[in-house]
Amino acid sequence: MDYRDVEPLREILHRVLVRYLTVTPAGLILDKDERPRAKVEARILSFGGARTLYRKRKPVCRSLDGVAAVTDPSKACAECEDRQRCTPQVRLDLIVEQRALRCLLAFTSARNFLEYEARLRRDGVFIEQVLHQISVVDRGTWGELRFSLLDPS
């Protein structure tokens, strides 16, 4: 698949209601009725900055670009009084088993992804052109994501 082939998929993904990939210490959950998986193969369509404001462990505001809130696009993150309480994240738009999924990475998983993406970029690999393995390391109360290349061509 040529990396330009994913552009129409990106456009569709940003316009539809997307399911979120759930990360647990036991693994990745693609659908609420499925058991956690230790690893999945994925195509990464896009990534970028995101922010989520949590109250009592529930998201109350989210931005998928770090600029404006999803629920109220006129609400600018830069001017929001709650900005300091937001969790900075990395947004991944994925295709896993022909399903469009979104994953929001915070802290360690975000760092792992950004280091992985920088390594690919340094090696001249377009992240959209290859298959990736995403695996979970059990950290007790949370799951840390690790990224590796499956398709080096």
What is the role of each PLM region?
Residues 88-149:
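Extended serine/threonine-enriched, polar tracts that run as long, contiguous segments within proteins
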Residues 1-100, 140-142, 146-152:
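OB-fold ssDNA-binding interfaces and closely related basic DNA-contact patches used
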